[in-house]
């Protein structure tokens, strides 16, 4: 059955079927191949796209801008100080105004309710570039990367997410894994595991797709036979005062070479959505080292630079998967 996503918003992977997600992944692969061959795209010719950012970004902003330009669209960027959204103008009114000017809208910010309100009132496709609850565009990039590096269908992949598993990445990876029938393990301290309602909802989805959702605080159990170990920063945007608490909670969950070896899988891959605190080459990294004596946090520099690491392929794939979302929905 053909997949048609025209006019659809992209707010969370919960809204999409396995077939629709696979369609976006296949389209991403095709668009990536065309870019590599130097084929100029025209799928978004004459389209106007607005990017609304409450939170700072490198990969998401660049991926949306380059993807849109690659396919012929025009882009307007509005940062946190460039619009009146939520300050002098309601989110609903902003959505209605921008919907008259633009063909598509991306939002990256704090509340999931904001992107949902924009989608409800804009009358155009709205894409979630990250909220505190979900980060769905990242998951498409992650799954495309797995398809490129692991010689298995997604529904045969064993995936371990290690660290703060109740953040937007933990939530979104669990949703995506359930949809695609994967063996997903959230490996974290009990207090940082995903919350019950979403877990039960995704276990029901996994029961239909042949997937499995496991929550554990046991690292050895969680990473055994894993094809993928994935981690993220220990402190999300807006939680910068939590470093001391998170370091105490998560240091036993740092991805190091011992953890890689504990998978028993010499061909496993390491993934991270970036940015990563793996060395002392950042201001924050230096501050953490001075205060807590750590040279790295969620992943060691050894693992980050090892043959197992595919983080920069993963980062590149943000471009191709975001392009696929825009092409498919506009």
Curated annotation (Swiss-Prot):
One matching Pfam family is OTCace_N
Question: In terms of one coarse class, where is the protein primarily found?
Answer: cytoplasm
Catalytic activity, as annotated = carbamoyl phosphate + L-ornithine = L-citrulline + phosphate + H(+)
Q: What class of enzyme is it?
A: transferase
- Pathway note: Amino-acid biosynthesis; L-arginine biosynthesis; L-arginine from L-ornithine and carbamoyl phosphate: step 1/3
**E.C. numbers:** 2.1.3.3
Q: Which family does it belong to?
A: Belongs to the aspartate/ornithine carbamoyltransferase superfamily. OTCase family.
The name this protein carries in UniProt is Ornithine carbamoyltransferase
Q: What's the gene?
A: argF
């Amino acid at each position: 059955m053909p997949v048609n996503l025209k006019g659809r918003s992209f707010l969370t992977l919960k809204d999409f079927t396995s077939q629709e997600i696979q369609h976006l992944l296949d389209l991403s692969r095709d668009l990536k191949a065309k870019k590599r061959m130097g084929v100029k795209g025209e799928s978004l010719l004459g389209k106007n796209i607005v990017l609304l950012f409450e939170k700072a970004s490198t990969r998401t902003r660049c991926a949306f801008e380059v993807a849109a330009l690659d396919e012929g669209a025009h882009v307007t960027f509005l940062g946190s100080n460039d619009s009146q959204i939520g300050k002098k103008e309601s989110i609903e009114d902003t959505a209605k105004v921008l919907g008259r000017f633009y063909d598509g809208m991306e939002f990256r910010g704090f509340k999931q309710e904001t992107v949902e309100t924009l989608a409800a009132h804009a009358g155009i496709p709205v894409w979630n570039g990250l909220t505190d609850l979900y980060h769905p565009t990242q998951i498409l990039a992650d799954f495309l990367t797995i398809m490129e590096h692991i010689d298995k269908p997604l529904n045969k992949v064993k995936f371990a997410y290690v660290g703060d598993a109740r953040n937007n990445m933990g939530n979104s990876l669990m949703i995506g894994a359930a949809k695609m029938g994967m063996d997903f393990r959230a490996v974290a301290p009990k207090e940082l595991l995903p919350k019950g309602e979403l877990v039960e909802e995704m276990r029901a989805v996994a029961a239909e797709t042949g997937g499995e959702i496991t929550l554990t605080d046991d690292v050895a159990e969680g990473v055994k036979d894993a094809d993928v170990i994935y981690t993220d920063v220990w402190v999300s945007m807006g939680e910068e005062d939590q470093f001391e608490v998170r370091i105490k909670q998560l240091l036993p969950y740092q991805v190091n070479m011992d953890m890689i070896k504990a998978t028993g899988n010499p061909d496993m891959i390491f993934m991270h959505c970036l940015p990563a605190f793996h060395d002392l080459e950042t201001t924050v990294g230096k501050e953490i080292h001075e205060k807590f004596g750590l040279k790295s946090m969620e992943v060691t520099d050894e693992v980050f630079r090892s043959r197992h690491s595919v983080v920069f392929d993963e980062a590149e794939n943000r471009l191709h998967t975001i392009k696929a979302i825009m092409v498919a929905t506009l």
